[in-house]
């Protein structure tokens, strides 16, 4: 190899021109991944907290409104009366015996925008929910509790409002940025499902009016 060629190779090896662009190309995808990741995961945390607060408000409303599900009784009836025994008097606490009050079972339904109670609750909490949420993401459950109510009185179940199948939508292309940053594969999803959230409260009397 001639001295001229050797000199050219050494000069090229010592040349620092363009190194800044190379470093920028390496660092920029990592920076963007961290930056947009902080934004999206911050949004996800905020939406999760707001959804929890929405469930608390929904349960408070559902506890004092007519049932959102069909088939929920309005009054507590007698349970099974054993032969040759005196039926319990109206006004007897349900907790006084296992069969004092009839157990209508647990009644569950999905939120329906056509139901007045579900519609009122959705109008109150929809602003706190992710934009992809609909009334169908709400589930209402009315469960009998023998510690509540008395024979002949208004039915007072434990009311549970649950949000389910709620997805968070990422707005940043985190998968593509991760690939540019050198991450193997691209397994980051565009959506992430929130865990089921629920709040339970004892019903006051499942009032027959609205907005009261």
Residue spans of the language-model regions?
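N-terminal signal-anchor/signal peptide hydrophobic helix marking the start
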Residues: 17-30, 40
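Short, conserved structural patches
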Residues: 2-4, 56-212
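Membrane-proximal amphipathic alpha-helices
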Residues: 40-54, 67
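A broad detector of short, well-ordered amphipathic alpha-helices
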Residues: 16, 23, 49-57
């Amino acid at each position: 190899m001639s001295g001229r060629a050797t000199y050219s190779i050494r000069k090229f090896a010592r040349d620092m021109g363009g190194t800044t662009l190379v470093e920028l190309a390496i660092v920029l995808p990592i920076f963007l991944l961290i930056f947009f990741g902080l934004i999206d995961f911050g949004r996800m945390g905020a939406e999760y907290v707001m959804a929890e607060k929405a469930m608390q408000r929904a349960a408070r409303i559902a506890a004092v409104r007519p049932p959102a599900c069909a088939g929920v009784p309005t009054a507590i009836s007698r349970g099974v009366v054993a032969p040759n025994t005196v039926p319990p008097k109206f006004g007897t606490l349900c907790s006084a015996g296992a069969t004092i009050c009839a157990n209508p079972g647990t009644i569950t339904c999905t939120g329906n925008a056509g139901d007045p109670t579900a519609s009122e609750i959705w109008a109150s909490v929809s602003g706190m929910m992710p934009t992809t949420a609909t009334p169908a993401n709400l589930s209402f459950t009315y469960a009998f509790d023998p510690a509540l109510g008395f024979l002949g009185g208004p039915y007072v179940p434990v009311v549970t409002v649950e949000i389910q199948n709620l997805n968070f939508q990422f707005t940043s292309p985190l998968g593509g940025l991760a690939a540019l940053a050198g991450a193997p594969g691209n397994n980051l999803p565009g959506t992430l499902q929130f865990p089921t959230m629920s709040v339970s409260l004892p019903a006051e009397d499942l009032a027959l009016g609205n907005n009261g």
